[in-house]
A protein has these predicted regions:
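P-loop NTPase motor domains
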Residues: 1-107
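Conserved ATP-driven motor cores of ASCE-family P-loop NTPases powering translocation/secretion/packaging/pilus
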Residues: 98-134
Length: 134
């Protein structure tokens, strides 16, 4: 219970509860039409990084379900997620499995990290891999 309470503590902030109480982002429209969505987080305060991770997790789940249920497995408009500072947003559950299954649904994800060690730190890979760098 203590761990649960600690994780939910940010919801004691009225402004966060307000933001999370309704949907004005229309994530369900992404994949139907060309859309640009920018998620900006603080680089000095990690308190709300979990909100970005939750949103991205929900977005991937929503898009996969939408592709399967409404479009026979492929979205009409390709969705490309470019996740800069990916290691700093928090964990997206089963992201390693997710990136292996989204491509067939017209969804792609490019994650941008500062170092190879961040791949291990966020749990995407268990051992060293070759990564193309510029």
């Amino acid at each position: 219970m203590i761990s649960c309470g600690a994780r939910l503590a940010p919801f004691d902030i009225a402004e966060l509860r307000e933001i999370m109480s309704y949907d004005e982002m229309e994530l369900d429209k992404i994949g139907d039409r060309k859309t640009a969505l920018f998620l900006i987080m603080s680089d000095t305060d990690t308190t709300f990084n979990f909100v970005i991770a939750m949103l991205q997790s929900q977005l991937f789940n929503l898009l996969c379900d939408k592709a399967d249920d409404e479009y026979g497995g492929r979205l009409p408009v390709h969705v490309r997620v470019i996740a800069d500072e990916f290691a700093n947003i928090g964990q997206i559950p089963q992201f390693d499995k997710l990136i292996a299954t989204i491509r067939s649904r017209e969804i792609s994800a490019s994650i941008i990290l500062q170092s190879q060690s961040q791949l291990k730190a966020i749990g995407i890979v268990k051992k060293s891999v070759v990564v193309k760098t510029h």
